[in-house]
Amino acid sequence: MSILSFLLGEKKKSASVAKERLQIILAHERTGHSAPADYLPALQRELVAVISKYVKIGDQDLRVSLERQDNLEVLEVKIEIPQH
């Protein structure tokens, strides 16, 4: 955040807020301090809210899953966007 943004009170874009939250969740998950995938329903709701600002989608149009294979975690987000 720049000094000018701080002084003028410029708000962050919702996409950057969502990105920061996702980075925090993934960093926290990597430390092994949380139960596996207990945050996925909340993450899905927040993603639907952010994406709905730009494209008309519902809860059923977005699916979030977390797969673990050995030391690798894959967070998969599938979004069905209706055609106009």
Swiss-Prot record:
The keyword Nuclease does not apply. InterPro entries: MinE, MinE_sf. GO terms for biological process: cell division; regulation of division septum assembly. Keywords: Cell cycle, Cell division. Belongs to the MinE family. Prevents the cell division inhibition by proteins MinC and MinD at internal division sites while permitting inhibition at polar sites. This ensures cell division at the proper site by restricting the formation of a division septum at the midpoint of the long axis of the cell. This is Cell division topological specificity factor.
